[in-house]
Amino acid sequence: MSVVNDDFKPLLIQWVEEEAINATKRGSKMVDLYNKILFQLRGYELPICDLKTLKSIKYVGDKTANQLRKKIAKHCKENELTLPRGFMDVAEKHRLDLEESNLTSSTSTIKTTNKRAKTSSKSKPKYVPKHRSGGFAILIALYLYDKDRNGMTKERIIAGATPYCDRSFSNNAASKEFYSAWSSAKTLENHNLISTTGRSPKIYFLTDEGVSLAQQLKTAIGLSSPPEGSKKNDRNMIMEQSFDNGIRLDTSFELSSPAGRAMLSSSPIRRISNPVHSNRAIQKMLEKELRNGETPPSSQHDAGNRIYDGIKYEVWRKEDYEVIVYMDNREIRSRADRDHFQTRLQTLGVKCEVKPLSSGDVLWVGRNTSTGTEAVLNYLCERKRLDDLCDSIKDGRFQEQKNRMKKTGIKHCYYLVEDMVSYQDKVYDLMDSIQSSLTQTMTTARLYLRRFKDIDETTAFIASNTKVIENLKSNLIVIKPQDIKNQQDYLNILLKFRNKFEKTQPHQDNPDYECVQLFSRFQDMLGKTNQMTVKEMFILMLMTIRGVSLEKAVVIQNRFPTPKSLLEYYHTEHATTDTNIKRDLMMNEFKDQIGNKKIGKALSEKIYNVWGKP
């Protein structure tokens, strides 16, 4: 066979053009993706000689790259050309390595000793798995837990290896994650680092080479014993070893007090970028809402009985409570793996429980170690996978969830977005909307936005954030109101206590207090339907009409304060109006609105069909 030209770019451009034409004929949405790839390929100046270079081009994902690789392989076969190693799949590379190995072994028998020495000096470098990868964790687990070299089952290895790996050992077909950390076991076997025996169950052993490499890895990371040795050391070790994937603590970490800085400087944990600091902008905005609302009556403080403005409260010292992470029970990895978050966080040394939450997907609470009473701490997360984010943008849940997070009065609200292994068509269609929505989350909504590669990075962030929260614990003033009228009253009470107790006087040596609500009050008051005002309920009713976003619903509610006023507008004021004119009433009523607040003809007719049709 002859050798193929190094640069495949001209062929790739030709093939992508053909795919774009075929997609156009079929009416497929993939035509937009192919056109974007085509534009990037034409502007790429360097030659494309391997699969890694091809994947580095913008918009070329794993699936597209694999399709193009197959076309290259077919082209080489039809034209009797040698397929470059960079475009071979794993099986082809393995077969080529075996052929080269056999050729080398047969040749070495007839070469001199000097020739053999020269050949061995040019041999391939020894395989060493990356730190905290699946292969690394499997070797460490077998070395630590299989002292007698009797072998271990897959389940036992995973249980021991999980603390030493940043990725999950189970795949998730729902998010197109078909490979897990356990896939590295095959690589270790191919490199003669582990061996297997039996079928059901299959038993895994370390080879002599595997024992030697595992011992070197153990020494390199300074690991002295298995995690079972000490629970406290276990948690510190696990957390210390998990801060290495770009979402961890760095020197830009902002602290509110010298005591906090001293506390973290002595901790084995490195510093996380932009996590827990006082969100002054949200606090000012909430205080402004309180000033614009009803003016509270003159407040009386009975410090002896711990009553402020007729509302009882408790004081918890830092030592009186522990930090617990609550995960919403709807947050799952897949239908077959519903307990992924809880299991993974507990492995990382985090106390985690699963229960339905009224707002958000991840909530940090303080539990009194004596009474068991629970209070909501000032940290809340909303988690979205990219495809779910697209759906929530289209149906209006995106804006609603952000508003509900702000109603909690929690100072540190995070919006966590997870990327997907392969994007669906709807993600490409809404790429511009996603970008603008995420930008608004940081600017207009003033929430912390964090974007992660996969579910494992999200879990690692939650674990590391929990550690920081534990180190920055404050004395708590736990509010215990007897009667809360609605969600706005819940927020007003919280802000009232903050204005009283969280503003330290300049000449007083007051401890650092945080005012928080009981978790039971949080659950009762912040549900989607619990204790809603007529205004909030009416807005939700309007948003059930397809096409009515939160912005449009608010505009309609400002013009028609109650459902009754909208019904009277159609059935009383315009009772004798022609039906065709009635269909356009909403469009004409809001014709002066701008942007996404304007109501079009089709939407006006939908609103008429629901509210104005006899």
UniProtKB/Swiss-Prot annotation:
Family named by the database record: Belongs to the XPF family.
Domain ERCC4: 324-421
Localisation: Nucleus
E.C. designation(s): 3.1.22.-
Name listed for the protein in its UniProt record: Crossover junction endonuclease MUS81
Assembly information from the UniProt record: Interacts with EME1.
Cystine crosslinks: none
Stated role: Interacts with EME1 to form a DNA structure-specific endonuclease with substrate preference for branched DNA structures with a 5'-end at the branch nick. Typical substrates include 3'-flap structures, D-loops, replication forks and nicked Holliday junctions. May be required in mitosis for the processing of stalled or collapsed replication fork intermediates. May be required in meiosis for the repair of meiosis-specific double strand breaks subsequent to single-end invasion (SEI).
Keyword Nuclease among UniProt keywords: yes
Keywords for this protein: DNA damage, DNA recombination, DNA repair, Endonuclease, Hydrolase, Magnesium, Meiosis, Metal-binding, Nuclease, Nucleus
Cofactor: Mg(2+)
Region: Disordered, residue numbers: 102-128
Gene that produces this protein: MUS81
UniProt enzyme class: hydrolase
Lineage: Eukaryota, Fungi, Dikarya, Ascomycota, Saccharomycotina
Gene3D superfamilies: 3.40.50.10130, Crossover junction endonuclease EME1, DNA-binding domain (1.10.150.670), DNA polymerase beta, N-terminal domain-like (1.10.150.110), Winged helix-like DNA-binding domain superfamily/Winged helix DNA-binding domain (1.10.10.10)
GO cellular component, one term: nucleus
